[in-house]
Amino acid sequence: MPLFTATELIPKGQRFVALANSQTYSTRTAGAILNEAARAESTARAFDIFLAHAYLDATLVAGLKADIEEMGFSVYVDWIQDSHLDRAKVDKATVELLRMRLKQSTSLFFATSDNSSTSKWMPWECGYFDGAKGKVAICPIAAQGALSEFAGQEYLGIYPYIQKDR
């Protein structure tokens, strides 16, 4: 079975990003209103999957989220559900919010990519979730082509990895 590929995910992610960026027609856009509603709704919501990822892969992650949701799962991505978070100002409130989101999630997918090794949060999220619930899987994103095998960082080898059914 093949892995998720950047070639497939980028167009989906670009559509999401374009839609989010196009909503600038007023000082309080429909997107802002929807984000507020989603934030209020999602504080009590459960998610099937917490998607740990590198923010540098935002377009890929948006496409991956869309792909997984098309399979019928709910997916938490911090900068989508909690767009008010300030990446330049990480504090205790940020950590508490992420802990709450991890607790609200049934499983964690660790999205590996060329950028994932630079993330400071991904190992923390993975370790926290593994200790709390143990339902962690690696979700490799192949840079190109339809690779069918994954070999990741050492400690990631203890987890199963996700393959995409075709």
Model-inferred region functions:
Residues 1-104:
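Conserved N-terminal substructure of TIR/SEFIR domains
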Residues 52, 109-113, 139-140:
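Conserved beta-strand segments of the P-loop GTPase G domain that flank and frequently precede/overlap
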Residues 71, 104-107, 132-136:
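Short glycine-/polar-rich loops that comprise or flank the Walker A/P-loop
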Residues 81-83, 114-115, 140-147:
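Short beta-alpha junction loops
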Residues 90-93, 125-126, 152-154:
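Short low-complexity, flexible loop/linker segments enriched in glycine and/or proline
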Residues 102-116:
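Extended, charge-rich low-complexity interaction segments
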Residues 114-132:
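Conserved TIR/SEFIR loop-to-helix hotspot centered on a Trp-containing motif
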Residues 138, 143-163:
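Glycine-rich, charge-decorated loop segments at or immediately adjacent to ligand/cofactor-binding or catalytic sites
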